[in-house]
Design a protein with these regions (language model features):
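Short, surface-exposed alpha-helix to beta-strand junction/turn motifs within ectodomains of secreted
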Residues: 396-440, 464-471, 480-484
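Positively charged n-region of N-terminal signal peptides that target proteins for export
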Residues: 1-6
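Surface-exposed, short loops/turns at beta-strand junctions within beta-sandwich domains
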Residues: 455-461
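Structural beta-strand segments of beta-rich domains
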Residues: 392-396, 450
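Flexible, low-complexity linkers/stalks enriched in Thr/Pro that connect modular domains
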Residues: 484-491
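Bacterial N-terminal signal peptides
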Residues: 7-20
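Beta-propeller domains with acidic blade repeats across secreted/periplasmic ectodomains
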Residues: 24-381, 385-393, 404
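Blade-terminus and WD-like Trp-Asp/Gly-His loop motifs, strongest in beta-propeller folds
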Residues: 442-446
Length: 491
């Protein structure tokens, strides 16, 4: 993550009067489909929500960056003012993961350990704390965050560990993903992490995490945590000496290169699945949630939603596997949250809880913290639903039929590609930009999909702006923007 004061930037560009108005207009448009409601936090409570867990009986648990866990009753009530807060636990260390499995324990990922917590005398306060695993290191550096997953399909909790600062790994497994088994055994699983911001499974049960711009990360990414894989930053690879199950240490990448070039040299290299272009989609990718609500959150079943802490937004992600490798497209989804989006939790009834904080990096939302809800209104926005790669271009599907005249025009689409330098230095500008012409457009008979024939660039992000496309009823796209990350071309 890298702090950039958006207010100062706007003032520098001379857009202070116009940009907030435009942003408010977009948020108002989005609110027709996905309204935001705010749960009022009691005075004196600093609820920087690091993690959220849905509990039975309309209750949620919320952990804070100050080491507390709060219960929120009536969290789903139509009237958010009826929410009631009670402190369950305190004295913990920046809890960035919460999960349960119906046995009375709450599992909390702290900076230095995975802990399970219980209220044994039913007085509403935790009184039993047990260490499940503490096999990684911590030395007090601000950057040594630890994020924890929900239980995976095998009953494991995954812990993803930030590096020490941006450039070193001073303690065991900093820059790694670890699996903690139900018995408390630690299994080093994936190397090459830098600065995680969130972790979750997709609908197939595979684990993904967000990583942030910095050394070896030209931008913010969504990456697949493939067991045995290396995801790009070699700083923590010194700990292969402690991870016999992982095999030999991968070859170090060459700086000032490109990901496809280094991937060809390093068999363990798992390329980023999704790139979030810096200062276009956001600046600090954070929490992740899969939509498994069977339509209760709208038309995006089995897609992922990803927060951005600096921009106070939630983005949308469509993933596909091509030649066995994950890749796909990201889209804007919802802006206008009160603080920096950090934690997401999507309940089975279609309520998405969004926890916010601005400490450390600042946020557009403007408030130091917030706990909010996002719900689907029942109205379907006109959006690109999915973006599939084909051997000769892309296929777009839409949430409603398109107008064949506007959707069938080449002029309705703007298209370019670019990539990032893969380097040890911090971040990267966009490089190697191309503007391949769209050779032809074919609209399906039912109007639900469009085929774009165009050249593809391996390892590039493909930026598509279908600003001229209208729905059959004449509506423009709510978000006429997509970025497809191309790791593989279909054979």
């Amino acid at each position: 993550m890298k702090f950039l004061n958006p207010t100062a930037l706007i003032a520098t560009l001379g857009l202070a009067a116009t940009l907030p108005v435009l942003a408010a207009t977009k948020a108002e448009q989005e609110a027709e489909y996905y309204p935001i409601s705010t749960l009022p936090v009691p005075e004196g409570v600093v609820l920087e929500a690091g993690a959220i867990q849905v509990l039975p009986h309309q209750r949620i648990a919320v952990s804070t960056r100050l080491g507390e866990i709060w219960f929120v009753d009536n969290a789903f009530d139509k009237d958010p003012s009826k929410a009631k807060f009670s402190r369950f636990a305190s004295g913990l260390h920046e809890v960035l993961g919460l999960t349960t499995r119906g046995d009375g324990w709450i599992y909390a990922t702290q900076r230095g350990e995975l802990t399970r917590i219980k209220d044994t005398n039913n007085d509403g306060r935790a009184d039993l704390f047990e260490t499940v695993a503490d096999s990684w290191g911590i030395n007090g550096d601000y950057h040594e965050y630890a994020f924890g997953s929900k239980f995976d399909r095998d009953g494991n909790i995954w812990v993803i560990l930030c590096l020490t600062g941006s450039f070193t790994s001073e303690n065991p497994y900093r820059g790694w993903a670890l699996r903690i088994t139900p018995e408390g055994k630690t299994i080093p699983t994936t190397s090459g992490l830098r600065s995680p911001g969130g972790i979750a499974t997709n609908h197939l049960g595979d684990l993904f995490y967000t990583d942030n711009q910095g050394p070896w990360n030209g931008t913010c990414w969504l990456k697949h945590l493939k067991p045995g894989g290396f995801v790009g930053n070699p700083t923590g690879n010194r700990w292969y000496e402690k991870a016999a199950n992982m095999g030999p240490r991968p070859k170090d990448p060459t700086s000032n290169s490109r990901i496809p070039i280094e991937r060809a040299k390093i068999p363990e290299f798992v390329p980023p699945a999704i790139g979030f272009p810096y200062n276009k989609m956001g600046q600090s990718a954070s929490g992740i949630q899969n939509d498994g609500t069977a339509g209760k959150f709208g038309p995006f079943q089995n897609q992922l939603f990803v927060g951005d802490q600096t921009w106070s937004t939630v983005m949308r992600v469509y993933l596909e596997q091509v030649n066995g490798v994950y890749q796909g497209a990201c889209f804007p989804f919802r802006e206008g949250f009160d603080s920096g989006t950090l934690s997401l939790e999507l309940a089975s009834d279609g309520t998405m809880f969004v926890g916010g904080t601005d400490r450390g990096w600042g946020a557009r939302g403007g408030k130091p913290f917030a706990l909010q809800r996002l719900n689907w209104s029942g109205k379907t926005p006109f959006e690109i639903h999915e973006m599939h790669v084909k051997p000769d271009g892309f296929e777009l599907t839409f949430t409603e039929p398109v107008d064949p005249e506007t959707a069938g025009k080449v002029e309705s689409y703007q298209f370019r590609t670019f990539t990032y330098i893969y380097q040890a230095n911090y971040g990267s500008p966009e490089v190697d930009a191309t503007t391949p012409p769209i050779e032809s457009v074919t609209v399906a008979a039912d109007g639900r999909s469009v085929r774009l024939k165009t050249a593809l660039n391996l390892g590039h992000l493909h930026e598509l702006k279908p600003t001229g496309v209208r729905s059959k009823s004449g509506r423009p796209l709510l978000h006429p923007l997509a970025y497809y990350t191309l790791n593989e071309i279909p054979r």
